Amino acid sequence: MSRPLILVTNDDGYSSKGIEILNNVASNFGDTIIVAPNSEKSGKAHGITLYDPIGLKKIDNQNQLIYSVDGTPVDCVKIAINSLLDKKPKLILSGINHGLNVGRSILYSGTVSAASESIMIGIPSIAFSLQKSEEMDFTNVDIILEKLIKNALDEDFPNDVVWNVNIPKTVNEKINGIKLTKQGKSNFNEIYHKRKDPRNNTYFWVDGAIESIEEDLDVDEVAIRNGYVSITPLSFELTSQKYLENNQSKGFFDFEK
């Protein structure tokens, strides 16, 4: 019986520690190919490259097929599916991101967007993120990955939903369990530090932190804060159903000549 094909990508770059660990675990379940950005591409969201050439380089690695892409995380998935792979992968895995992707900040996430591209092509996918810490300790993360990847390769895993998995930094000590959660309303509050270069031109460095505004344990960021692995099932139907239900019958948008 042939092994399933698994596409592995991220937004931190093909040489990051997170993607190495994710690929090592995934390779226990199938044949993996890494197609990832050539450098850090965090915050690129669902952006694609339209007006510049996209460079592609095969990385010399005896044990693993790796392609480095001079483009966004979504570029990586599109190029892999359209040009590099001979067959459709059974699963797309994105990560492990160095830092959480929770709340409204997932709209900025290249990690989540690379996984969510799969919805458009009907392939199951998971985005993995590990809470940031000083040392970025990945100890015991493989246990979580093994459990979830095994589940995802089940025939019943949906191909119109992305699992957004966030792992607390306490995973190397203790976790309280795995919890199915909803996307919260937490924001990433940015601070833009204004500076001057040697030629007196203005430039900025961005910094910031997640603002916690909820206490419901069924919310992604709150579950993480309480030591749970959070799995948020994401779909990308962005229509406000509540607004439609409340306003569609009013007729105030009717146009009469």
Describe every region a protein language model picked out.
Residues 2-6, 17-83, 87-88:
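A cross-family phosphate/adenosyl-ligand binding-site feature
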Residues 9, 35-37, 94-97, 128-129, ...:
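Short beta-strand segments
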Residues 114-118:
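Hydrophobic/aromatic ligand-binding patch that stacks against planar heteroaromatic rings
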Residues 126-153:
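Short, glycine-/small-residue-rich phosphate/pyrophosphate-handling segment
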Residues 158, 162-164, 168-257:
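C-terminal accessory domains and tails appended to enzymatic cores
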